[in-house]
A protein has these predicted regions:
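Active-site proximal loops enriched in glycine and acidic residues that flank catalytic Cys/His/Asp
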Residues: 47, 71, 100, 282, ...
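Active-site core of metal-dependent hydrolases
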Residues: 10-125
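Composition- and surface-driven signal marking solvent-exposed, interaction-prone regions
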Residues: 219, 294, 316-317, 343-347, ...
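Short, compositionally biased "basic patch" segments
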Residues: 1-8
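C-terminal amphipathic alpha-helical interaction region
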Residues: 507-703
């Protein structure tokens, strides 16, 4: 890659964006496409043919030889099938490059090989991908050459959603319709659309590729299943925001260049809290585009890391004892006029529309806390949530001092008469500039926090698509808006009705507001007293997806059908069971083939040393004590290994579903922890040269 470049010159150069379409498409075709994007109008095949031709010509100019419908099935990662632009050879033996409107609009991958949760039988293979024209096509360049990637939705032959994008787009329509209803009540007749804006911050680890390949657990599961803590971890806080090392800086430069060319607004990069941990954050985009971009970010991080002799770990908890990784899903609502509905203004107590929006969101989060928690449920996330490094598993809302004061006024007196003045920041140094204080501090222990003009949902796992959480957020807030509008549209005295409703929602849902330390034991007790759910694991979270309340909610806004929700719950149970099964089998393999043989070999050497020392006429007490300690731990390891084998076999023999997932959680996972304990103790006392894999110190500090 080039050493120096101008970001403005390269940004979006590989994106078939609005400017490119306006330049290349005939005026009428461009106008029809914009109408389809903005108003949801249908596109006729003749117009699609013109768009496809120009898209193909543009992509070929970029070096593309293939195109793919780029979609997001329920595997958690993107999927793609590549077709070249060549047509059947002519009589001369030459080929033409072609791409039709039909090929642009619709693809037909095999749906039977993707998770469907019973929606599709193995013999029912037909599935469709449909062009999402609101997310621009782009050319991706990698070792395979250049490929035209067309973002698409994925559905079954009978129309059920088999992906993340379809319900996300449905939820965006729901929040748009209900937001427009709400702002119309306040006299805004100009806005035609309200869009959820999303900015997902991405955390990740980087390790040396050679060391990665010496760890079966990292290869098969993405996290270390064994590993003792090194003498130093993250306790000095010296890695967070520290100077970025040259190898990492070179990697970040190449990541940024690739992302900028594909139109991803990579904005912020820094070292995170744990050693070898880093973060990348983009500028906000429309929810569906932001979801697509986050998938591109994860793919690009992994690809560029390999090119730099490293591996990017996106698992939520790749290393025990140091922080794991997540995504902060920043969410707001913006009109097509650029108005942010979550902007409180200078005097939020006077901003009635904002207060209604705010209290509706509190109502939504309080009433659907379990569903919001479920949207972040993942086997890896079970290691993070509630572990004093990430938000607790209890959903609460942090508002900050100013907004909490406004809410307290509403709850206690029935009206808000003032907003706290944030004032200036006093540094005590005359040469430093005077700084205005923000309206709220940051609370990193809160799962759902207001940060000035947006909410930040901090529970999402680092590997997960942010689609799931945004589907839930959009839908539950749309429902709260809908209920509020149902009341206010019938009111004879709108001003009184809206004030009464704001007070009602603030009072009824004030229990969800918590500005304190979410890591404390006191909060767990207080949350229980308030009646807030504390859902600690993925298997305990999944049932919220298929309650009658949830089904009614999603069916009301045509986001999910009952069958789609039931299928997703089934898939999640299966995914949990499969993930833990792979981890358990990997531990069994590593313990049986690497760790126990290495320890036996080492004890043999140690026993020889004991005998040699004794023969030399010296008391071998130290060596003998060490040999005894290792032998005891080796016995515990073998005993724990046998237990893990037994419960893993029992779990694998069970019928797939909730019962099997719970058995993996209740029996297999604890058995894995029991096997890890003696192995990690052994690593602390066995000669490093005898240990069969790189240590935490090697992985975290040698990259």
């Amino acid at each position: 890659m080039s050493e120096l470049f101008n970001v403005a010159d390269i940004f979006g150069e590989n994106v078939f964006d609005d400017a490119t379409m306006q330049e290349r498409l005939p005026k009428k075709v461009y106008k029809d496409l914009k109408k389809m994007i903005e108003e949801g109008k249908e596109l006729d095949l003749a117009t699609a043919d013109v768009i496809a031709h120009e898209m193909k010509e543009w992509a070929i100019e970029k070096g593309a030889t293939h195109y793919t419908h780029w979609f997001q099935p329920l595997t958690g990662v993107t999927a793609e099938k590549h077709d070249s632009f060549i047509s059947a050879p002519m009589e001369t033996g030459k080929v033409l490059m072609s791409f039709s409107g039909k090929e642009l609009i619709k693809g037909e991958p095999d749906a039977s090989s993707f998770p469907s949760g019973g929606l599709r039988a193995t013999f029912e293979a037909r599935g469709y991908t449909a062009w999402d024209c609101t997310s621009p096509a782009f050319v991706r360049k990698d070792a395979a050459g250049a490929t035209l990637c067309i973002p698409t939705a994925f559905c079954s032959y009978t129309g059920e959603a088999l992906d993340q994008k379809t319900p996300l787009l449905r939820s965006m329509e729901a929040i748009n319709e209900q937001s427009l209803r709400l702002i119309r009540l306040f006299g805004n007749t100009r806005a035609k659309k309200v869009t959820p804006s999303v900015g997902p911050e991405q955390e990740y680890f980087l390790v040396d590729a050679k060391k990665f390949l010496e760890r079966k657990d990292l290869i098969y599961t993405g996290r270390t299943l064994f590993g003792a803590m090194p003498p130093k971890g993250q306790e000095l806080d010296d890695h967070y925001f520290g100077t970025i090392r040259q190898r990492i800086a070179s990697f970040m430069k190449d990541v940024n260049e690739e992302l900028w060319k594909m139109g991803v607004t990579s904005k912020t990069q820094h070292n995170e809290v744990a050693p070898a941990q880093h973060e990348l954050a983009p500028i906000y985009a429309k929810a569906n585009v932001a979801v697509d971009h986050n998938q591109l970010v994860m793919q690009t991080l992994k690809r560029i890391a390999s090119e730099h002799g490293m591996k990017c770990l996106l698992h939520e908890k790749p290393f025990a004892g140091v922080n794991g990784s997540g995504k902060h899903n920043n969410w707001s609502l913006t009109t097509d006029e650029g108005k942010n509905l979550l902007d409180p203004g200078e005097t939020p107590h006077e901003n009635i529309q904002f207060l209604l929006v705010l209290t509706c969101i509190l109502k939504a989060v309080d009433e659907h806390a379990a569903l919001l928690r479920e949207s972040a449920a993942d086997p890896g996330n079970d290691h993070r949530l509630g572990a004093n490094e990430a938000p607790p598993a209890i959903i609460s809302v942090f508002l900050g001092e100013q907004l909490e004061d406004v809410l307290e006024q509403l709850v206690t007196t029935g009206e808000a008469t003032h907003s706290l003045n944030t004032g200036k920041l006093e540094t005590g140094v005359r040469t430093l500039p005077e700084l205005a204080k923000d309206t709220s501090d940051r609370n990193r222990t809160s799962p759902f926090t207001f940060t000035g003009n947006k909410f930040e949902f901090r529970m999402v796992g680092s590997r997960d698509s942010v689609a799931g959480s945004n589907i839930v957020l959009n839908t539950i807030v749309a429902d709260a808006f809908s209920q509020a509008c149902d009341v206010l549209e019938k009111a004879d005295d709108f001003e009184k009705a809206v004030h009464d409703l704001i007070k009602q929602y603030a009072t009824e849902h004030y229990r969800i507001v918590f500005n304190g330390n979410g890591y404390s034991d006191e909060w767990v007790k207080e949350a229980e007293r308030r009646g807030l759910p504390n859902i600690r694991s993925m298997v305990d979270a999944i049932p919220a997806l298929v309650t009658e309340e949830t089904i009614s909610l999603f069916e009301k806004f045509h986001v999910f059908t009952r069958a789609e929700l039931e299928s997703r719950a089934e898939i999640k149970y299966e995914n949990y069971a499969k993930a833990i099964n792979i981890e358990a089998r990997t531990m069994i393999d590593m313990a049986s083939k690497q760790i126990i043989p290495a320890i036996i070999k080492y004890t043999r050497s140690l026993a020889d040393t004991v005998n040699s020392v004794r023969e030399a006429g010296v008391d071998p007490q130290v060596q003998a004590d060490l040999l005894k300690e290792i032998t005891v731990l080796l016995g515990q390891t073998k005993e724990a290994l046998d237990v893990l084998k037994k419960v893993t076999e029992e779990a694998a023999a069970m019928e797939e579903g909730e019962s099997q997932a719970r058995y993996y959680h209740d029996s297999v996972f604890p058995a894995m922890e029991e096997l890890r304990r003696p192995v990690d103790e052994l690593e602390m006392i066995v000669d490093k040269e005898a240990w069969p894999m790189p240590s935490y110190g090697d992985l975290l500090f040698e990259v």
